[in-house]
Curated annotation (Swiss-Prot):
Recorded family membership: Belongs to the mitochondrial carrier (TC 2.A.29) family.
GO CC terms of this entry: mitochondrial inner membrane
A Gene Ontology molecular function term of the record: solute:inorganic anion antiporter activity
Protein name: Kidney mitochondrial carrier protein 1
Keywords linked to the UniProt accession: Acetylation, Membrane, Mitochondrion, Mitochondrion inner membrane, Repeat, Transmembrane, Transmembrane helix, Transport
UniProt topology in membrane: Multi-pass membrane protein
GO biological process terms, semicolon-separated: inorganic anion transport
Function: Antiporter that transports inorganic anions (sulfate, sulfite, thiosulfate and phosphate) and, to a lesser extent, a variety of dicarboxylates (e.g. malonate, malate and citramalate) and, even more so, aspartate. The sulfate/sulfate exchange is much higher than the phosphate/phosphate and malate/malate exchanges. The transport affinities is higher for sulfate and thiosulfate than for any other substrate. May catalyze the export of sulfite and thiosulfate (the hydrogen sulfide degradation products) from the mitochondria, thereby modulating the level of the hydrogen sulfide.
Intracellular or extracellular location(s): Mitochondrion inner membrane
InterPro entries, per database record: Mit_carrier, Mito_Metabolite_Transporter, Mitochondrial_sb/sol_carrier, Mt_carrier_dom_sf
Intervals holding Solcar repeats: 7-96, 104-189, 198-289
Annotated positions of the N-acetylserine modification: S2
Amino acid sequence: MSALNWKPFVYGGLASITAECGTFPIDLTKTRLQIQGQTNDAKFKEIRYRGMLHALVRIGREEGLKALYSGIAPAMLRQSSYGTIKIGTYQSLKRLFVERPEDETLLINVICGILSGVISSTIANPTDVLKIRMQAQSSTIQGGMIGNFMNIYQQEGTRGLWKGVSLTAQRAAIVVGVELPVYDITKKHLILSGLMGDTVYTHFLSSFTCGLAGALASNPVDVVRTRMMNQRVLQDGRCSGYTGTLDCLLQTWKNEGFFALYKGFWPNWLRLGPWNIILFVTYEQLKKLDL
């Protein structure tokens, strides 16, 4: 086996940060849509937004354009850890199974994607909790990233920073286990078929396809994960929140219907599409650098 290659880690992190900055307002509207309408939390019971565009306009009008980037600092911190580990681990694990990219199979890529998703998301979970908490705030964020981080730690302890970690790992296993293999297989077949070469157009089409596949597979888990992470330690006895991820799933389905699990799907897909396009196009261009 060849020595561990550092390039996928660095390139993956840089490409992930670039993609995050380019699509963050869409991600914020997704979070706001997913946390609204919760009958067991008075703060988020009201249906404030009718959809993604309405959320973008209303947030910008009522809270200012700066609010569309609420939580960008922990999001970039998350991608610098999660994105770096995810891409680097995925590429490294593949080389453990096969030496040449041409010998990769769908099964190998899925296994490597699932493992890299679980590992990277578990390590980066505190930054994910922080990002969602800051995105959910509908007023000026107080204390900044460090202040919010300390607030979560002081009120909820270490467990608060890893709240929803099992669901985050499950979601990452689904997303990474779908997106990265779909990208690789789509790109491989487009090139081998002779329809397209190894060009930016191939990278564009492959990344768009994997974004759609990832959104369809992950949205229900994403809704539950977002609600679990946004749930605070409540003092009101009538507002007990969710006892666990399964309880959150069942309550959401029972109180709001099955399609509540696909709340935020359009901003989720419209984010994952451009996000993956920016990610993979940037990553492929970085790979061409002679370093």
